[in-house]
Amino acid sequence: AEFSAELSNLGVRVANLEDRIDNVKWGGEMRYTASKRMFHDGPDSSLNRLELRLKPVATINDHWLVRARIDGRAFMDTDTSTSVSLKQANAEGHYGNWTIEAGLLPVTTEQGIVYDDNLSGGQVTYANDKVTALVTGGRISTGRFVDRYKNDGVKELPGEKAFQSTGNFGKAALTFRPSSKFDITGEYIHISGLSSENYTPETKAYGSDTVGIWGIGANYKFDKNVKLSGYYGENTKGDLEKKFNRNFSAELRYKGASKADHGSFGLYAAYRHLGNMSVVAPTFGTIEPSWKGWEVGGEYTFAKNIVGYVAYFDGENIADRGTDVKKIWSRIRYFF
């Protein structure tokens, strides 16, 4: 009887251990990115980067889980690498139509035009079939703000950059989906305490330490293969000309690659304008803040969980006498 009890207890302990192991799921990807910027009568630059992203998800209970992302990077052209670092670590709770997030979490604005990165803070979302409402608040460091370019094609130096200090980030967004083919989103992004008063992309200084960007975006699906997306946003703070304080994007997309579907593909064409003070960290790999122009690209699934991307940009700096710029960008992602 005693031996039987010990076996029973051992079985319970093993079962508990298995349950805990099952509570943590690991996923991620390895991605390789290569790109080249080519300025007319200006400096060219290239990127040749390998990146590993690990994404564990731990279930806490019926309502809560914890997500994290751990990144490591290597630069293939110089044979150097960076230290592995924590990019995301946030708790996520689900209660009916409500989702609550807190920690170092990913935040994306409509279509990723203004922001697609992480920050330290919290987010509350309400979503049903027709409406999604979202409120975000937190702190955003200067490292989140993507580099801008001067009119000669040179990156702004540290003392010339628009955002000189960690700021307070707030966002509110409301999405309405009247049908399965159409959705429209209105949003407002407010960032304060940036020490950006002296930023001068041309001759006039910005004159404010705050960014206040309102934006409207919409998506329309003509059928299962063709989608048209549009966005317009404007920063109402500061004293710069409107070309620096506004952004807009129009994109036509055909199909799309799925990592689970070998042979699937997608194509797109777009025109975008990303004013220096109207965006923070856009989602795009080709066009960059302070540029405007045309972009075309495509994606293809070579095998299950292996997807390749390529894009080409042709445009110019937004500043007067802005230098013409072209950029080729490519990426391959191995999901696991």
Q: Where are the regions that the model predicts?
A:
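Functionally constrained cores in energy, signaling, and assembly domains
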Residues: 10, 48, 330
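Short, low-complexity, polar/charged sequence segments that are solvent-exposed and flexible
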Residues: 119-123, 152-155, 203-204, 286-290
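N-terminal periplasmic/intermembrane-space "pro-region" immediately following the signal or transit peptide
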Residues: 1-29
